[in-house]
Every structure is written in C-alpha cells, then in structure tokens.
C-alpha cells in the first residue's frame, strides 16, 4: 500500500472514530429519566464544624414568614427593609462583617459561596424554628439587575409577593418569572454537553460556562452514594450524574420562597454537609454559588410532584427530571399572577410578558439608578 493511501486511510479511520464518539455521546436519551437527588450524601472531610452563630433573634414563634437577607457592606443602607417588617420577620446577615465571638446572632462562618452561605447558615442554626408561614430568601441590595420588576426594585416585589399563593402548589417558588439568563429555554445547552464543555475551556473566565460544565460532577458529589460512587443503589432510584443530553432547567438568580415543610423534608445534617461542601471546596465563590442556584429547587419542590414511586411496591424511584424541569420553569404569565397578582397580562410568551422585565445592558444597572428611583 502506498504511503499516501495509508495516510488517507488512517485519517478516515480517525475521523470516523471521532464522529462516532460525538454521535454516541450526544445520542437521544430516554424520557422520564430519574435521578437519586432526594438526599444530600456528601461526607465532609473536616472533623470540626463551625459554631452556631447564625441564630435569627425572635424567630421562634413568629407568625410571619422569615425574610432571610444575604448582604455585604457594599450593598449600602438597609433601611429599605424596615418597611417590610410588617410583612416579614427580618433575618439580615452581613456576610463580610467582622466576627463577633460574643454573639450567636446573624453571622456566617465564612464569606464564601455568595448567598448560599447565608441561606444554609439560616437553615442550620434556625432549623427548629422555621416559621409555619415559610421563608423568603433574597440578596441584600434593593435595586439589582435580576429583580423581576420594571424598575428592578426588590422592595416593590416583596411588598406584592403573595407567599401563600406562591407556596400553595409546590411548596417552593423562585421569585423570577422572566426566563432571561435562566436555563429554562429549550435553546439552553445541557450542562453536560460537549458544547458546554468546550465553552468552559475556550472561555475560562465565563463563570456561567464554568459552573454549567461542573454541574454534572457536583451533583454526583452532593447526591452520590457513600464513597463517591456515582451510581446510586437501586433503592435510591437511579443515578446521580447528568448525561450529555440531560438538562437541568432552572430559574436565575437564587431568590426564592419556600415552605417550612419543604425545608424540614431534609435533615439538618444535610444542610451542614452542603455548607461544608462550600467551605471545603476550591471553586470560586461565583462558581460554587451559581452551582447551588441549580440545586435549591431540586431540594425544595414538593416531592409528590415529581418523585416517582413504583405503583406496586411504593419504592422510591427517584426524581423525574422532565417533571422537575416543568415545575422549575412555569410560564411567565402564570408566575406573575400567582406571585405578584399581576394577572391577565397581554403579549406574553412562555418566558416573558411585555413590559414586566427587560434585561439591562451587560447585566448592570446605571450607577445612579438607586438615587433616581427611590
């Protein structure tokens, strides 16, 4: 065989092999895939755990929903929260404040993981006193680009929020209704896809790409069996790692309302383990915080809605991913009505309603926005 012919044959074989692998990895997956994401199984490596310093004063016995606020000093004055005290029991954590070793109140063990550190610390240190009315989890600045309100004003959203209606069906609801910058649209690439992996490599400074690409492995770390086995036992209902064509559809930006029962369906130790994953990990705050923004709805959406069970044995069969995605991304028109009483809106698509929200340029508000819109 001539050398040029041999070289051409080798190239054909290599090309065919690569093409086969690409097609195989991206082959259609069966519907109704189930995942054993019912319990946090991560095992912390640290022998010592942080002291409890995140107690919210006066929470025990409160008849109002808790408003859990994760803020930094740069968020500015928090006086805007005072007007909400009639509706909520305020639990405000300033995560970059110096530690007060004499106090057990409203402190976090470290400024890591963005809002997730505050949220988990609240659940851990107030586990026995979550209000019957539920809890709302938000960021500390009043005006933020992702607040789903024409003026991006969280005080308006929270004053209008109907907590009872929001929790009635599923026991959990993200505070955003518009789908922009979420993974709700079908056009958003699956987190484990080759497209996402390539994007993370080609644009390493893109935190969204980095967190999306890391999600399959992280879900295996958090929900996997003891010893890091990514194949959960049959009693846990399937695997824990996303395939290349499996997409977790989730709303942006880690502000949500959740019922007490949904928080208590997981043990306090699970929240401790999840917080330790942040404290012990090496990922950047943006990446770890964004990854957990994909996890909240997995933890809290009402189990009966998508935790499939065998009709004969009632054995646990895992979370149905398709149903989970549907619950995580309700139509915008339904969402605005359910959460904020903005009903019968016109010119609505699946993920937006005209005039309700507009994505600001570069995901930023003008520097003088707060001064001109208070």
Q: Can you describe what each PLM-predicted range is?
A:
Residues 2-374:
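ER/Golgi luminal nucleotide-sugar-dependent glycosyltransferases, focusing on the catalytic module
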């Amino acid at each position: 065989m001539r050398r040029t012919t041999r070289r051409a044959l080798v190239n054909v074989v290599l090309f065919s092999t690569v093409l086969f692998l690409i097609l195989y990895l991206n082959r259609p997956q069966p519907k109704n895939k189930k995942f054993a994401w019912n319990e946090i199984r991560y095992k912390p490596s640290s022998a010592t755990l942080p002291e409890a310093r995140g107690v919210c004063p006066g929470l025990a016995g409160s008849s109002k929903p808790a408003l859990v606020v994760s803020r930094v000093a740069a968020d500015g004055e928090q006086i805007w929260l005072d007007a909400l005290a009639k509706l909520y029991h305020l639990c405000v954590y300033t995560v970059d404040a110096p530690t007060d070793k004499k106090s057990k109140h409203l402190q976090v063990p470290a400024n890591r993981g963005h809002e997730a550190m505050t949220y988990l610390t609240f659940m851990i240190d107030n586990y026995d006193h979550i209000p019957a009315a539920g809890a709302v989890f938000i960021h500390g600045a009043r005006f933020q680009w992702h607040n789903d309100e024409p003026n991006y004003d969280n005080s308006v959203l929270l004053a209008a929020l109907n907590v009872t209606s929001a929790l009635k069906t599923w026991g959990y609801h993200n505070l955003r209704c518009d789908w922009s910058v979420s993974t709700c649209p079908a056009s958003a690439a699956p987190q484990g896809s080759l497209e996402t992996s390539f994007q993370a490599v080609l644009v390493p400074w893109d935190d969204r790409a980095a967190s999306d690409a890391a999600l399959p492995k992280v879900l295996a770390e958090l929900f996997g069996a003891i010893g890091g086995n990514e194949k959960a036992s049959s009693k846990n209902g399937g695997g824990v790692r996303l395939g290349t064509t499996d997409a977790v559809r989730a709303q942006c930006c880690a502000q949500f309302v959740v019922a007490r029962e949904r928080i208590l369906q997981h043990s306090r130790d699970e929240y401790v383990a999840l917080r330790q994953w942040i404290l012990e990990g090496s990922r950047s705050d943006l990446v770890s915080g964004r990854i957990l923004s994909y996890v909240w709805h997995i933890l809290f959406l009402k189990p009966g809605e998508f935790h499939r069970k065998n009709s004969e044995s009632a054995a646990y069969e895992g979370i149905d991913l398709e149903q989970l995605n549907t619950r995580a991304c309700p139509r915008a028109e339904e969402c605005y009505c359910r959460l904020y009483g903005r009903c019968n809106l016109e010119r609505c698509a699946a993920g937006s309603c005209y005039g309700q929200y507009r994505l600001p340029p570069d995901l930023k508000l003008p520097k003088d926005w707060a001064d001109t819109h208070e």
